[in-house]
C-alpha cells in the first residue's frame, strides 16, 4: 500500500531518496526554499544545475529536472518549476499540477522509493496556499498508484499555515489504496 505523510519540518534535513526543490526556470538558485537548498546542497549540485542551464536553457514552468542532492540527506534533487501567481487566469493551476506530476514522474523514473515535496509556489511566487494544497494533494493522490517505484510521499510543510491547510485536506481523505499519515 502506498503511503502519504504530512510532516512539519525542514525539508533539507529530512532523509528520503529524492527531495523536490521549488526551483526557478534557470535552475541556478533563487529565493526562499530554492536559495536554502542551493546553499546546503553545495557545489556538485550547483555544477549540475549550471550544466542543465547551459545545455537546456534551464527548465520550463511546470517541468522538472533531476540532479544529485549534494550535501543534503537524499540521493537526488528534483527541481520542479512552479508558476508565479498572477491572477489565476494565466494557466497557473494547470502549471502547478504539471510541476507536481512531472516531479513525481521523475521520482519514479529514478526509482526513488521515498520522495519529499515542499509547498511549491506558495512562497515568493505567491500562489494562494489553500488552492496550492488542493492541487498538490489531488495531483499526487491521483498519480501515485500508477507508479511502481515510489512507495511513500512526504508533504513537508515548514510554515504553520501550510501545515494546517494540508492537515485539514488530508484528514478528510479516505482512499483504500493510500495510507494517509499525519505527524
UniProtKB/Swiss-Prot annotation:
Source taxon at top rank: Bacteria
Entry-linked InterPro entries: Macro_dom, Macro_dom-like
UniProt keyword Cytoplasm present: no
CDD domains: Macro_OAADPr_deacetylase (cd02908)
Domain Macro: start-end pairs: 1-174
Family: Belongs to the MacroD-type family.
Protein name: Macro domain-containing protein
Amino acid at each position: 500500500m502506498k503511503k502519504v505523510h504530512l510532516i512539519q519540518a525542514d525539508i533539507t534535513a529530512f532523509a528520503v531518496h529524492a527531495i523536490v526543490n521549488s526551483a526557478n526556470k534557470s535552475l541556478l538558485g533563487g529565493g526562499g526554499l530554492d536559495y536554502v537548498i542551493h546553499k546546503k546542497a553545495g557545489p556538485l549540485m550547483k555544477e549540475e544545475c549550471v550544466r542543465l542551464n547551459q545545455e537546456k536553457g534551464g527548465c520550463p514552468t511546470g517541468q522538472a529536472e533531476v540532479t544529485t542532492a549534494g550535501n543534503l540527506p537524499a540521493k537526488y534533487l528534483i527541481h520542479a518549476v512552479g508558476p508565479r501567481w498572477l491572477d489565476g487566469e494565466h494557466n497557473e493551476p494547470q502549471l502547478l499540477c504539471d510541476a507536481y506530476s512531472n516531479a513525481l514522474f521523475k521520482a519514479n523514473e529514478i526509482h526513488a522509493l521515498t520522495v519529499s515535496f515542499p509547498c511549491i509556489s506558495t512562497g515568493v511566487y505567491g500562489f494562494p496556499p489553500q488552492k496550492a494544497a488542493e492541487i498538490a494533494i489531488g495531483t499526487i493522490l491521483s498519480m501515485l498508484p500508477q507508479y511502481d517505484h515510489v512507495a511513500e510521499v512526504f508533504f513537508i510543510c515548514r510554515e504553520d499555515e501550510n501545515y494546517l491547510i494540508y492537515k485539514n485536506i488530508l484528514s478528510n481523505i479516505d482512499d483504500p489504496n493510500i495510507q494517509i499519515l499525519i505527524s
